[in-house]
């Protein structure tokens, strides 16, 4: 987990974080600072290693231009070195929402869990003290603990507005906008009761987006769902600056989706 979180950490950051309160979280970032003679294989600096090997072979007369093989030995090995830096940041909360309705098959639910799991792992490894809340929904929404969020397998109809209402109420009760950086991430296959789309978009546009630093919606492809909710968001709210949309066709697309949701420069 730590290794993948470190890899992600080179390309991601919590978007639009702002100083809002005296209660700080700690941001930890890794920065490559130089080259060392020792280190793990995952950080081997191949260019520097082969340069050292070439220089050694030339100086000892073992380099043959007609047979230019460069064979590094232990003393040639060079590794990237890094330094962890910590800086105070303002407090933040991430609210995860996951569709567990019947149109979400086992594969779709697994893709959503994998993606949200790694986002969660990365956030915790880089933002010490960040708060997290978890919502699952089918036709109704409820708050659950982290373990239930990543393990529950429910079914039923879909009413996305139930999750957005609960998220809105959670923010109003516990997270004053003036004091918190608030992020909401919703994972679904985009299937929703037709009459509910209008209510969803109203809650999202009028209540959630004004309170959120960022709203991320990741839609997984499903053979059972209509998948139309992504298009509804694009047409009504796609121009809003604090909304990010991602499609996840399969497991191979998970990393790209994470980069879309939390990539630098947002």
Label each residue range with its predicted role:
Residues 1-90:
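Acidic/polar low-complexity segments with low predicted structural confidence
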């Amino acid at each position: 987990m730590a290794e993948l979180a470190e890899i992600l950490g080179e390309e991601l950051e919590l978007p639009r974080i702002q100083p809002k309160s005296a209660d700080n979280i700690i941001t930890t970032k890794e920065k490559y600072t130089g080259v060392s003679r020792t280190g793990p294989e995952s950080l081997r600096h191949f260019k520097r290693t082969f340069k050292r090997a070439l220089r050694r072979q030339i100086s000892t007369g073992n380099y043959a231009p007609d047979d230019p093989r460069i064979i590094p030995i232990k003393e040639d090995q060079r590794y990237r070195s890094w330094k962890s830096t910590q800086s105070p940041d303002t407090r933040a909360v991430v609210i995860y929402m996951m569709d567990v309705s019947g149109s979400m098959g086992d594969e779709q639910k697994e893709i959503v869990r994998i993606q949200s799991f790694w986002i969660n792992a990365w956030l915790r490894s880089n933002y010490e003290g960040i708060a997290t809340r978890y919502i699952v929904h089918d036709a109704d929404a409820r708050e659950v603990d982290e373990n239930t969020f990543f393990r529950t397998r429910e079914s039923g109809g879909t009413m996305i507005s139930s999750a957005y209402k609960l998220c809105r109420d959670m923010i109003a009760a516990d997270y004053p906008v003036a004091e918190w950086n608030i992020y909401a991430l919703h994972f679904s296959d985009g299937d929703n009761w037709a009459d509910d789309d209008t209510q969803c978009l109203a809650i999202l546009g009028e209540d959630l987006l004004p309170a959120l630093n960022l709203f991320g919606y990741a839609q997984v492809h499903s053979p059972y769902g209509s998948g139309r909710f992504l298009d509804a968001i694009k047409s009504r709210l796609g121009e809003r600056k604090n909304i990010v949309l991602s499609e996840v066709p399969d497991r191979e697309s998970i990393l790209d989706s994470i980069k879309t949701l939390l990539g630098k420069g947002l």
